[in-house]
């Protein structure tokens, strides 16, 4: 593993063109302004380098000199510590713990619903779609209180949530009624960030082709 990693003089991200976890990491890299190379990986055709570096052959996988990491949250926290500015986690331990809990809940609850919409039966997908829409609208008031997710500053929690919100049209979810204004305002603020725009692959841009 170390020999293969050492062949790369530039930080390299193995990334899926539409993989939501890869998208999280791409946002962090763009936010940090890090110079890196990207290797786009097709799901059923991993390159030999990835096979050699990661026994799971999963994306995202980050190679930084002799270090190889996989699992998006591990990569994101590593990048935030490796490149401290701008910070994407709070300074104080209590706030950091809360942020980690928010990321866990987003993945456990909302990403699970997303996967059910994509992979479940028609009835399962309909139920998950309804639940995800209702839960997002239920928390919408928090987006009217702060520019970002319970914070004045863009954070790793936003890097978790934004890729999911970007994919909502593809999931068949739209918003109207109470909470929609706040939620759409948050989405606009995040989607217009230079780092978010830079993070998008061509395939991800096409998810919202023709939409504002």
UniProtKB/Swiss-Prot annotation:
Pfam family, one: GST_N
Induction field: By amino acid starvation.
UniProt-recorded name of the protein: Stringent starvation protein A
Disulfide-linked positions: none
GO CC, one annotated term: cytosol
Residue span, GST C-terminal domain: 92-209
Gene Ontology BP annotations: positive regulation of DNA-templated transcription; response to starvation; response to stress
Gene designation: sspA
Keywords: Stress response
Residue ranges constituting the GST N-terminal domain according to the UniProt record: 9-87
């Amino acid at each position: 593993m170390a020999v293969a990693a050492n062949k790369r003089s530039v930080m390299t991200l193995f990334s899926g063109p539409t993989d939501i976890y890869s998208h999280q990491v791409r946002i962090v890299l763009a936010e940090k302004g890090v110079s890196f190379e990207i290797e786009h990986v097709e799901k059923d055709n991993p390159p030999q380098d990835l096979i050699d570096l990661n026994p799971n052959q999963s994306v995202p996988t980050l190679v930084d000199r002799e270090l190889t990491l996989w699992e998006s949250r591990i990569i994101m926290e590593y990048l935030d510590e490796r490149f401290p500015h701008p910070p994407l986690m709070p300074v104080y331990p209590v706030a950091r713990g809360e942020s980690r809990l928010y990321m866990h809940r987003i993945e456990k609850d909302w990403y699970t619903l997303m996967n059910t919409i994509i992979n479940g039966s028609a009835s399962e997908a309909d139920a998950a779609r309804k639940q995800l829409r209702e839960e997002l609208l239920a928390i919408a008031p928090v987006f009217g209180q702060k520019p970002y997710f319970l914070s004045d500053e863009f954070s790793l929690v936003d890097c978790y949530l934004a890729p999911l919100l970007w994919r909502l049209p593809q999931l068949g979810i739209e918003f109207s009624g109470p909470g929609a204004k706040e939620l759409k305002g948050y989405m606009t603020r995040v989607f217009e960030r230079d780092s978010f725009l830079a993070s998008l692959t061509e395939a991800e841009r096409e998810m919202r082709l023709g939409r504002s």
